[in-house]
C-alpha cells in the first residue's frame, strides 16, 4: 500500500510522517529500492519489529533480570514454551509474538521498554530520524519545527 501511494505521489502521503518497519530497508526481506523521501522514518534495525523483540528475548539468559522466575511469573520457559526451537521464518515469529500479548504489557510496552533500555544508541538514532521527518513535514505544512535546523 505505501509503495503504491509513494509511487503515485498521493498528497496526503507526501505531507505526513510515514514510519515504516526497519526490515523495509533490508533488500533480502523488504521493499527493494525503498523510498528515501524526507518524510519517512524507519523503526530501528533492519529487522521486523517482531523479529527484533524475538531475538532480544530468545538471546537472554533465563536468569536475566527481565524474567520473573517466580512460580507464577513470566519466565523464559513460559515465553518460549510453544516454540522451544529458534524460529527463522517471519510468519512463525509473528505468530509467537501475537501469543505473547497477555504478558507483554499494553501495546507490548514491557518488551519495547526492555529493548529501548538495551539499545539506547538505536533509540537515539530513531528519535533523530523522526525529528528530521517531522521538521520536513512541518516546514511543508506551516507548523513549528522541533529541531534546531530549518529543512
Could you describe each region identified by the protein language model?
Residues 1-151:
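Acidic, Mg2+-coordinating catalytic modules of nucleic-acid enzymes
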Amino acid at each position: 500500500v505505501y509503495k503504491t501511494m509513494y509511487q503515485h505521489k498521493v498528497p496526503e502521503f507526501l505531507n505526513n510522517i510515514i514510519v515504516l518497519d526497519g526490515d523495509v530497508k533490508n533488500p533480502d526481506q523488504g521493499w527493494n529500492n525503498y523510498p528515501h523521501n524526507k518524510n519517512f522514518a524507519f523503526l530501528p534495525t533492519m529487522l521486523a519489529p517482531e523479529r527484533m523483540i524475538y531475538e532480544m528475548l530468545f538471546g537472554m539468559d533465563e536468569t536475566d533480570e527481565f524474567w520473573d522466575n517466580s512460580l507464577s511469573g513470566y519466565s523464559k520457559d513460559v515465553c518460549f514454551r510453544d516454540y522451544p526451537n529458534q524460529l527463522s521464518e517471519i510468519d512463525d515469529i509473528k505468530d509467537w509474538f501475537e501469543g505473547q500479548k497477555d504478558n507483554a504489557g499494553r501495546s507490548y510496552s514491557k518488551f519495547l521498554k526492555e529493548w529501548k533500555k538495551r539499545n539506547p544508541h538505536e533509540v537515539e538514532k530513531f528519535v533523530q530520524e523522526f525529528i528530521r521527518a517531522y521538521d520536513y513535514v512541518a516546514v511543508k505544512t506551516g507548523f513549528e519545527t522541533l529541531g534546531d535546523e530549518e529543512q
